[in-house]
Every structure is written in structure tokens, then in C-alpha cells.
UniProtKB/Swiss-Prot annotation:
This is Adhesion G protein-coupled receptor E1. SMART domains: EGF, EGF_CA, GPS. One of its GO terms (biological process) is adenylate cyclase-activating G protein-coupled receptor signaling pathway. Expression is restricted to eosinophils. Keywords: Adaptive immunity, Calcium, Cell membrane, Disulfide bond, EGF-like domain, G-protein coupled receptor, Glycoprotein, Immunity, Membrane, Receptor, Repeat, Signal, Transducer, Transmembrane, Transmembrane helix.
Length: 886
């Protein structure tokens, strides 16, 4: 068969070749085998003999031009059939068809292959069909770290997850460069083609896996506080960690505030051992496990404005006193409180003391229990019932016992203000004791309001301004108490009138009122601007010859005594006595009977002497200003001294008792302070000048303007007193003015702002005068003959001694008015001090010859001689003028 085909193919080729080159036109042979004539059929056709005929048929792959399969027409041609344009394509899918003459050739497209191979033509063995080539079977088709994906007729390479295509290669992708690759609190770990997320220490994955990718899982904080911290501590969980903190009241054993070491312990802090005390002064600290508590000692209570919780706990003194506060510095009372057996002589005394303290302790020891004024008052009644037994005690024991009792009653009353009971009793009336109290609410809302409190016929009148001045910080209240029978034991033997030390032995004293007491909350108890008025009922009618004395009970190292300081008599009648006091205290009235001539005598001497001094000072000032013959620096010093003394004594007479206006009284006291100090400083100036004069006797013109200027002397004489007054007023402005006189306060020690400089000047003057007398003794013998013959040496010596009194001896006498010679000292002080102006006029005017001559000319009307020797007058004028330069 194969050979036949080849033969046929060859024959066709030969015929084609022949036909193409030899194509003679001849008439077909109709007889026999017609197909012998090759020209009968066109090229690419076959001739087929039939009976008596033939027909032509185009070969395979060709088609007749007339569309007939068999034809004889010589004009018909066989045209090549384009099989590749047929549909479907003869080569099949995924192939390419190439038309050939009479046939076609099949080849597979790229990516496909046929078992017969490409360039297949019909007739070749096998069936041509194109199937896809799987390129991915070849390992080198795609680069490393990529995946090959086969497709129909092709393939593709894609980088694996975790890689990125770059320059026909697959490079690793660093997923950790993206902050969103892992969740919060995780660490990203990049690997080749992959990455992993690991939770940070202190966190764990929500998926439960150690490593993970992406945000499908989260890192959740591990709560380490379940069992990581020791006892008495607090565990604080933080993101990824934790720390331990000891509870308040505990401290870590390693000293670190926050710790994680499990070996650390939280140990209790003993806050009560700290210095200074955690609770503050006057407190009691009690330590507890992890805490402590604060309390206050007796006599103190917690400050309501602070708290232990806030760390500002403090104890402030209660409104009332407790046992520790009222015990005076007395050996007998101390023995009663030592807890040991007392001497038989003190048994009764200690029993009375302990009875009083038992009532007071009930109030002080229980700081929260309310205090009933009625109950505590009745508790003191048994003490007053036994007051007659106090007469067997010594004076010191009686005064100590009275001090304890009076202060205990005051403390109990103040306690009732601080811890009042539900049923407040404003007044308690008993046979031996009356108390009327008043809590201040709206009573003092208006100005100039006064309150009256009455007890046993006695009365206390107090203004709201005084209550406000008491500086009460909590409950404000006042009370008035009157005791029955206490005047019999606290009698006149406990009184010493320090304001009238000159009373004679003929004066008799007696108690003539009940002992009363004013009680008020607040720390300030005395020195009030507005006085407190006490009206005390006389036990016996006052006689005309009797002088009442208001006395207050003052405690001292020996227990206590009556004193007249701080109170004055406003009015006295037969039935009552009105006292004006600048203090809240226990009071009574003592009647003094007998001759009081010495007090009156001093009053007359003082006022008459001051009036005489004022007249003399006016004359001296006029003399220094008008007498030209003696006008020099020395007379200027005398002039300033006289002016200051004149103003001081005038203001003293006119304003010492102007106490109605508080501010005006303080101003008067301030001016008196300044003027009297100025007198002393000008006296000091004169002492210095006198010293210089005697020391420089040989140099007559020793006081020239170029040595000492008057301006400097004035600055000293007026400036230093002003400095003392300004400093004193700045330190204690309330020291100026008292309730009974406009002078410096003698009860607070403020008087030393005057006495201090005075004593200093006196000491300096004494030293200068002593030195002056010594120099005078040495120099008088060397004075030139001309001066010594003037017989003025005795006058100079007299002036030196007289200057001693002018420069302060009288004030020395005033300071030493104590002891048995107090009366004599008082007389000397009053006489010399009141006549100080007269002494100045006598020494510097009447004993000066030039002045006497001027007086004579003024009186007689004669004119001054034209020529007069001044040489003999040098020492008489005490100091030459600067213009007298010889």
C-alpha cells in the first residue's frame, strides 16, 4: 500500500511536470483507452476511463473550477484547496496550519506538542493532535522560592508567601518592618520566607500558642499579682510586669518603695518611735500592726481642723485646765500627788486637794463625755462646806488650796462650754455657790452690746468687744461665779497693796465682799481695751472713813495672794462697790480704814511741784531765748531740755487720765514715752558736754562749730528717743495705754522700753560725773590765775554736783521704792522729780550772774553798758560761745 502511494505520488509529479512542459493540443482519442491521452485532464486531475468515454476528477486537495467532481471539459482547472481556512481547522486546536499545494502541514503552538511531532502532513503515520506541555515539570523554569503554575499552552511563576519578585528572582520579604505585622506587646522574628510573633515577657498569646502570625491573636497581660507579693503588701499589675508596695504602716526590708523581689518582707513601722513625734506635741501615740493611733494628753484635745488620716493631727489645749495645769509649784501639793504615804501633818490638806482633783479628773480624763454644769457645780459644794477647816492650814497651804479650787471651778465651767450637755443650764444656784453662764451666739451681732451676769447678788458687766478680744477659737462663752464663805479664809492677810506702799500701820484692812470670779473662753485673760465692770455686794455697810480696794487673786510660787493691780474703784456706796478691771479674774473687795494722809500728801506735793516746775521752765525758756548775753551753744542745750520737760509735764498733767478713747490714750502714752526719753537723752548730752568742758579747761574755746555741730546734737537728742519709740511700738503696739492711765503697760513688762534706756543713761551719766569730778580735782589747781581769781571755782563745783540730780539721781530714787525705805524714797523721788524744772531754772538762770544782771535791767528798765568785760563770765555761763575765740 505504501509502495502504491509512493508510486502514485511520483506519477502525479511526473505528470505535472510533463503537463507543464509538454501540452500539445490534440483531439482525444475516443476509441480504446482514452485516458492514455494525458492531456485530457488538467493538472492535478486524474483521468478515469469509462465505456467509450472518460472523465476527469481533481486530485485530493484540489477542487475543480466548475465545482463538479467529474468533468470532461478541457477548460476546467483543478485549484488547490486551502484546508487551513476551513472550520474547524483540520489540524485541531492549539495548533497552527500551513497550507501546501494539495495538502497542508500541521504544527503545534508554543506550549503544546503532538506525538507525531510538528510539520505533520496528512498521510504521515499517526494522528496529529496538540496537547499542553507542562513546563513546570522542569525545575529550572522558575527561580528559587517560587511556585510554577501550568496553564494551557503556557505557565507562570509566582513567588512564594514571604518573598517578593525583584529582577526575575524571589527575595525574602521582611514582614517585621511593618509595625502591623504583630499585635501590641509582641516581638516580631523574621525568617526566610516567613516570620513569627512572640509575646513579650509578662504577656501571653490569646491563642495559647507560643508563636503566631498576624493579628489573629493578641498578647494579653499576665496578671502576676495572684501570688507574687508578700503579706501586708499590695501588688500593682502593670503592662507586662508588676511591682509590690507595702501597705501604709509597713516598710520593705530592702528599703525600696516598689519592689519585685519575692524575698522582701513588709515589716511594721513603729510610728510612735519617730522623732519628732508623728502625732505632734502634747500627744499620746499608740502603735498597732500597720497603723497607729493618736490621742492627746490630759488638758489637750485633737484639733478639729486636722486629722490623723490627713497627716496633720495636732493637739491643742482645751478651753479648761486639768490637774497638771492647776498644780502650783508647791512642795505640799506635789507630795499629795506622788502616790506615796504623806506625812501626818499633810493628811487633811492632801484630802482636800484630792477631793478637788477628783471632780476635775472626771472632766479631763474622759474627753468625749458631756459636762453638766449643774452636776459639776454640786460636786464642789462639799468642798465649800468644809472651808472652815482651811483655817488650820498654814498661810501657804491655804493659798495653794484656794488657787487649786478657784482654777478647778473655772476649768469645770469652761469644760461645760466645750462639751455641753443636752440640757444646758444657764444658771446654777446652790447654798454655797452660784454660777451663771451664757453661750454667745447672736447676742454680739450688734455693736456696743453688753452682757450682765448675776450670782448671789453680785454682778459682772462685760462688753461684746471684750469677748471678741479674748480670741476664742471655738465655743464662746462667759460665766460669773460667786462663792459663799471663801472670804473668811482668803481674807486680808493675803493682801499687800503694792499701789499704796506708804500706808501706815494704823490702817486696818478687812474683807467686805464675797469672792467672785469672771470666766471666759479664749486665751486672752487680761489687758483688755474695754474694762469689765464688777459690782460686788458689801457684806457690811461701808463707813465714810473706809476706802474700798478692788483686789484680784494672783497666783505665785507660794500659792497666791490678793493684788490691786488691774482694777480701780469706779463707785462705792454703803451697799455695793463697783470695780473696773482690765482682766478676767477672781475678785473681792477689801475695806481699808484709817489715816491715808501719806497718799494725799504725795499727790499734793507731786501736783504742786509740777506746776512750780512748769512756771520755772517757762521762765527758763524765755531767759534762754531773750537774754543775748548768755546766748551760746550751752544755753541751746538747756533750751532743748527745758522744752522737752515742759511738754512732757504739761501732757502728763492734762492727759494721763484720758482713758475714755483707747486710740487717744495710746497716742498720749506714746508722746509721754518720747518726751521723757528725749529729756534723758538731752541730759546725757549735757553730761557729755560738761565732761568735755572740764577735761578741756585749759582750752577755753573747746566747743567750736568745727568740732561738734548743733545739727548732730539735735539728731542725737531727738532721733534716738524716736528710734526707741518706733521699735517699741512695732514690737508691742498694745503696750501703750492702760485702762486706768495713759502710760506704758506695767503688767506686761513693756515699761522696760522706758526704764531700760533710762537706766542706761543714768549709768552713763554717773560714770561721766564721777570722771568729771576726778578731772575737776586734777585741773582746778592748774587753772590760770586770771580765772581762779574770779572765785568761780566753787560755782563750777556746785554746778557739777547739781547736775548729778538733774541728770538722773531723782529717777534712781524712783526705781528703788522697795523695802522698808520705800516711803522715804517715794518722798525724795516725788519732791526732786516734780521740782526738776525749778532746779534747772535755779542752776542755769538764778545762779548765773549775767542772767541776774539782765533780770535787774529788765525790772529797773536800765540799758546795757556799752563796754563790759566778758572774761570773768566764762565759767559762770558754763560754756563759752564759739564766737569768743581769743
Amino acid at each position: 500500500m505504501r509502495g502504491f502511494n509512493l508510486l502514485l505520488f511520483w506519477g502525479c509529479c511526473v505528470m505535472h511536470s510533463w503537463e507543464g512542459h509538454i501540452r500539445p493540443t490534440r483531439k482525444p482519442n475516443t476509441k480504446g483507452n482514452n485516458c492514455r491521452d494525458s492531456t485530457l485532464c488538467p493538472a492535478y486531475a486524474t483521468c478515469t476511463n469509462t465505456v467509450d468515454s472518460y472523465y476527469c476528477a481533481c486530485k485530493q486537495g484540489f477542487l475543480s473550477s466548475n465545482g463538479q467532481n467529474h468533468f470532461k471539459d478541457p477548460g476546467v482547472r483543478c485549484k488547490d484547496i486551502d484546508e487551513c481556512s476551513q472550520s474547524p481547522q483540520p489540524c485541531g486546536p492549539n495548533s497552527s496550519c500551513k497550507n501546501l499545494s494539495g495538502r497542508y502541514k500541521c504544527s503545534c503552538l508554543d506550549g503544546f506538542s503532538s506525538p507525531t511531532g510538528n510539520d505533520w502532513v496528512p498521510g504521515k503515520p499517526g494522528n496529529f493532535s496538540c496537547t499542553d506541555i507542562n513546563e513546570c515539570l522542569t525545575s529550572s523554569v522558575c527561580p528559587e522560592h517560587s511556585d510554577c503554575v501550568n496553564s494551557m499552552g503556557s505557565y507562570s511563576c509566582s513567588c512564594q508567601v514571604g518573598f517578593i519578585s525583584r529582577n526575575s528572582t524571589c527575595e525574602d520579604v521582611d514582614e517585621c518592618a511593618d509595625p502591623r505585622a504583630c499585635p501590641e506587646h509582641a516581638t516580631c522574628n523574621n525568617t526566610v520566607g516567613n516570620y513569627s510573633c512572640f509575646c513579650n515577657p509578662g504577656f501571653e498569646s490569646s491563642s495559647g500558642h507560643l508563636s503566631f502570625q498576624g493579628l489573629k491573636a493578641s498578647c494579653e497581660d499576665i496578671d502576676e499579682c495572684t501570688e507574687m507579693c508578700p503579706i501586708n503588701s499590695t501588688c500593682t499589675n502593670t503592662p507586662g510586669s508588676y511591682f509590690c508596695t507595702c501597705h501604709p504602716g509597713f516598710a520593705p526590708s530592702n528599703g525600696q518603695l516598689n519592689f519585685t523581689d519575692q524575698g522582701v518582707e513588709c515589716r511594721d513601722i513603729d510610728e510612735c518611735r519617730q522623732d519628732p513625734s508623728t502625732c505632734g506635741p502634747n500627744s499620746i501615740c499608740t502603735n498597732a500592726l500597720g497603723s497607729y493611733s493618736c490621742g492627746c494628753i490630759a488638758g489637750f484635745h485633737p484639733n478639729p481642723e486636722g486629722s490623723q488620716k490627713d497627716g496633720n493631727f495636732s493637739c491643742q489645749r482645751v478651753l479648761f485646765k486639768c490637774k497638771e495645769d492647776v498644780i502650783p509649784d508647791n512642795k505640799q501639793i506635789q507630795q499629795c500627788q506622788e502616790g506615796t504615804a504623806v506625812k501626818p501633818a499633810y493628811v487633811s490638806f492632801c484630802a482636800q486637794i484630792n477631793n478637788i482633783f477628783s471632780v476635775l479628773d472626771k472632766v479631763c480624763e474622759n474627753k468625749t463625755t458631756v459636762v453638766s454644769l449643774k452636776n459639776t457645780t454640786e460636786s464642789f459644794v462639799p468642798v465649800l462646806k468644809q472651808i472652815s477647816t482651811w483655817t488650820k492650814f498654814t498661810k501657804e497651804e491655804t493659798s495653794s488650796l484656794a488657787t487649786v479650787f478657784l482654777e478647778s471651778v473655772e476649768s469645770m465651767t469652761l469644760a461645760s462650754f466645750w462639751k455641753p450637755s443636752a440640757n444646758i443650764t444657764p444658771a446654777v444656784r446652790t447654798e454655797y455657790l452660784d454660777i451663771e453662764s451664757k453661750v454667745i451666739n447672736k447676742e454680739c451681732s450688734e455693736e456696743n452690746v453688753t452682757l450682765d451676769l448675776v450670782a448671789k447678788g453680785d454682778k459682772m458687766k462685760i462688753g461684746c468687744s471684750t469677748i471678741e478680744e479674748s480670741e476664742s477659737t471655738e465655743t464662746t462663752g462667759v460665766a460669773f461665779v460667786s462663792f459663799v464663805g471663801m472670804e473668811s479664809v482668803l481674807n486680808e492677810r493675803f493682801f499687800k497693796d503694792h499701789q499704796a506702799p506708804l500706808t501706815t500701820s494704823e490702817i486696818k484692812l478687812k474683807m467686805n465682799s464675797r469672792v467672785v470670779g469672771g470666766i471666759m473662753t479664749g486665751e486672752k485673760k487680761d489687758g483688755f481695751s474695754d474694762p469689765i465692770i464688777y459690782t460686788l455686794e458689801n457684806i457690811q455697810p461701808k463707813q465714810k472713813f473706809e476706802r474700798p480696794i478692788c483686789v484680784s487673786w494672783s497666783t505665785d510660787v507660794k500659792g497666791g495672794r490678793w493684788t490691786s493691780f488691774g482694777c480701780v474703784i469706779l463707785e462705792a456706796s454703803e451697799t455695793y462697790t463697783i470695780c473696773s478691771c482690765n482682766q478676767m479674774a477672781n475678785l473681792a473687795v477689801i475695806m481699808a480704814s484709817g489715816e491715808l494722809t501719806m497718799d494725799f500728801s504725795l499727790y499734793i506735793i507731786s501736783h504742786v511741784g509740777i506746776i512750780i516746775s512748769l512756771v520755772c521752765l517757762v521762765l527758763a525758756i524765755a531767759t534762754f531765748l531773750l537774754c543775748r548775753s548768755i546766748r551760746n551753744h550751752n544755753t541751746y542745750l538747756h533750751l532743748h531740755l527745758c522744752v522737752c520737760l515742759l511738754l512732757a509735764k504739761t501732757l502728763f498733767l492734762a492727759g494721763i487720765h484720758k482713758t475714755d478713747n483707747k486710740m487717744g490714750c495710746a497716742i498720749i502714752a506714746g508722746f509721754l514715752h518720747y518726751l521723757f526719753l528725749a529729756c534723758f537723752f538731752w541730759m546725757l548730752v549735757e553730761a557729755v558736754i560738761l565732761f568735755l568742758m572740764v577735761r578741756n579747761l585749759k582750752v577755753v574755746n573747746y566747743f567750736s562749730s568745727r568740732n561738734i555741730k548743733m545739727l548732730h546734737i539735735c539728731a542725737f537728742g531727738y532721733g534716738l528717743p524716736m528710734l526707741v519709740v518706733v521699735i517699741s511700738a512695732s514690737v508691742q503696739p498694745q503696750g501703750y495705754g492702760m485702762h486706768n492711765r495713759c502710760w506704758l503697760n506695767t503688767e506686761t513688762g513693756f515699761i522696760w522700753s522706758f526704764l531700760g534706756p533710762v537706766c542706761t543713761v543714768i549709768v552713763i551719766n554717773s560714770l561721766l560725773l564721777t570722771w568729771t569730778l576726778w578731772i575737776l580735782r586734777q585741773r582746778l589747781s592748774s587753772v590760770n590765775a586770771e580765772v581762779s581769781t574770779l572765785k568761780d571755782t566753787r560755782l563750777l563745783t556746785f554746778k557739777a554736783f547739781a547736775q548729778l540730780f538733774i541728770l538722773g539721781c531723782s529717777w534712781v530714787l524712783g526705781i528703788f521704792q522697795i523695802g522698808p525705805v520705800a516711803g522715804v524714797m517715794a518722798y525724795l523721788f516725788t519732791i526732786i522729780n516734780s521740782l526738776q524744772g525749778a532746779f534747772i531754772f535755779l542752776i542755769h538762770c538764778l545762779l548765773n550772774g549775767q542772767v541776774r544782771e539782765e533780770y535787774k535791767r529788765w525790772i529797773t528798765g536800765k540799758t546795757k553798758p556799752s563796754s563790759q568785760s566778758q572774761t570773768s563770765r566764762i565759767l559762770l555761763s558754763s560754756m563759752p560761745s564759739a564766737s569768743k575765740t581769743g
